């Protein structure tokens, strides 16, 4: 499965949507997702913009926040085991990534800003 880097400096949100949908077997261009989410150079992509794009593409979403890092990691693994794909806000709420799989005790993390977008991390090392 091929995942993609973000096409602009401000489009990590649409790129993360794109990569999550690829993991589900759907292919959309980042440009289309940028248009649907109204991402822009000044403010990037807010949570509401992510939700808007997913809804317009016909996909559901759930939001969650956790009080502890341990609860967060547990929820990530739980959702991946159920077959869900995650789009997560990181770096002090400034950068979107996707987490698309859990297997053999590793998370498959897709960071569209990195040259090698796919990383395998243990839940313990995730978030550090």
For each predicted feature, which ranges?
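Conserved active-site-adjacent core of cysteine acyl-enzyme catalytic domains
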Residues: 22, 32-128
């Amino acid at each position: 499965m091929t995942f993609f880097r973000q096409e602009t400096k401000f489009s990590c949100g649409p790129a993360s949507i794109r990569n999550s949908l690829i993991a589900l077997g759907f292919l959309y261009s980042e440009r289309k997702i940028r248009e649907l989410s109204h991402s822009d150079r000044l403010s990037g992509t807010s949570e509401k913009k992510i939700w808007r794009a997913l809804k317009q593409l016909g996909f559901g979403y759930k939001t969650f926040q956790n009080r502890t890092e341990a609860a967060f990691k547990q929820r990530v693994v739980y959702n991946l085991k159920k077959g869900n794909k995650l789009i997560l806000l990181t770096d002090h709420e400034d950068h979107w990534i996707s987490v698309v799989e859990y297997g053999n005790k590793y998370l498959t993390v897709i960071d569209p800003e990195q040259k090698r977008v796919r990383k395998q991390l243990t839940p313990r090392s995730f978030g550090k």
